[in-house]
């Protein structure tokens, strides 16, 4: 879900006019992976562009390397491709990682950047929605859905294992207490 809040503030002891800050947040982007749908991310990028008035944009996520670099990378790569359509995504990723160590955490986020750049171009009328883009998007959604299901299954197994371990520990402690009495 996208959220936008606008704040005005004037720093104390500074004679400058007040600042206007737009805080945009996207709470549906899971950590270490990426959303299924590129549309909200592209909408957030377009909103950030429209609000910044050529002022700096600050981007952050909890760790500062995965989602933040993806978000920045989408806009950065889209601009680079518009300037020169011969740029290679892998070179752009290397460039991003030179600016932020370990930026973009794996193939899912890397693929999501591709999807979002293409979605930007589709929305801007540069690429058609039907055809290769739709097939690529469908493949991505299928792959990520399977990945998410596998991760959920692993988390469930891990949780069950921890419960069993705790139960075993409690039984062991309980039998030890009975023996010492």
Where is each model-derived feature located?
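Cys-based phosphatases of the PTP/DUSP/CDC25 superfamily and their flanking regulatory architecture
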Residues: 1-181
């Amino acid at each position: 879900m996208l959220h936008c809040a606008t704040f005005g503030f004037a720093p104390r002891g500074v004679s400058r006019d007040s600042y206007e800050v737009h805080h945009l947040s996207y709470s549906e982007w899971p950590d270490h992976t990426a959303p299924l749908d590129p549309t909200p991310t592209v909408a957030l990028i377009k909103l950030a562009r429209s609000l910044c008035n050529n002022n700096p944009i600050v981007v952050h996520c909890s760790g500062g390397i995965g989602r933040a670099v993806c978000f920045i990378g989408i806009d950065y790569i889209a601009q680079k491709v518009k300037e020169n359509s011969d740029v290679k995504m892998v070179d752009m990723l290397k460039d991003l990682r030179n600016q932020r160590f370990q930026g973009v955490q794996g193939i899912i986020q890397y693929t999501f950047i591709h999807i979002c750049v293409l979605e930007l171009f589709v929305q801007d009328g540069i690429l058609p929605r039907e055809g290769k883009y739709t097939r690529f998007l469908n493949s991505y959604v299928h792959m990520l859905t399977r990945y998410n299901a596998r991760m959920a299954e692993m988390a469930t197994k891990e949780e069950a294992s921890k419960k069993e371990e705790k139960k075993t520990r409690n039984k062991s402690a309980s039998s030890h207490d009975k023996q010492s009495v």
